[in-house]
Amino acid sequence: MTQSNPNEQDVELNRTSLYWGLLLIFVLAVLFSNYFFN
């Protein structure tokens, strides 16, 4: 039980970091597209 909990937490951290990275890339893409089109 105690050994599986840290592993699950690591997976959750990896997923959250991945989603934050995708969100950051999406925001940067929108900002760059607005900058170039304007």
From Swiss-Prot:
Q: Which family does it belong to?
A: Belongs to the PsbL family.
According to its record, how does it sit in the membrane? Single-pass membrane protein
Know the name of this protein? Photosystem II reaction center protein L
Q: Which Pfam families match?
A: PsbL
Localization terms from the record: Plastid, Chloroplast thylakoid membrane
Relate the protein's function as given in its record. Answer: One of the components of the core complex of photosystem II (PSII). PSII is a light-driven water:plastoquinone oxidoreductase that uses light energy to abstract electrons from H(2)O, generating O(2) and a proton gradient subsequently used for ATP formation. It consists of a core antenna complex that captures photons, and an electron transfer chain that converts photonic excitation into a charge separation. This subunit is found at the monomer-monomer interface and is required for correct PSII assembly and/or dimerization.
Q: Which GO terms describe its cellular component?
A: chloroplast thylakoid membrane; photosystem II reaction center
According to the record's subunit comment, the protein's assembly and interactions are:
PSII is composed of 1 copy each of membrane proteins PsbA, PsbB, PsbC, PsbD, PsbE, PsbF, PsbH, PsbI, PsbJ, PsbK, PsbL, PsbM, PsbT, PsbX, PsbY, PsbZ, Psb30/Ycf12, at least 3 peripheral proteins of the oxygen-evolving complex and a large number of cofactors. It forms dimeric complexes.
Q: What is its main location?
A: plastid
What is the protein's species of origin?
Answer: Oenothera argillicola (Appalachian evening primrose)
Key word Membrane present: yes
UniProt KW keywords: Chloroplast, Membrane, Photosynthesis, Photosystem II, Plastid, Reaction center, Thylakoid, Transmembrane, Transmembrane helix
Q: Which residues cross the membrane?
A: 17-37
Record flagged with keyword Iron: no
Q: Which GO terms describe its biological process?
A: photosynthesis
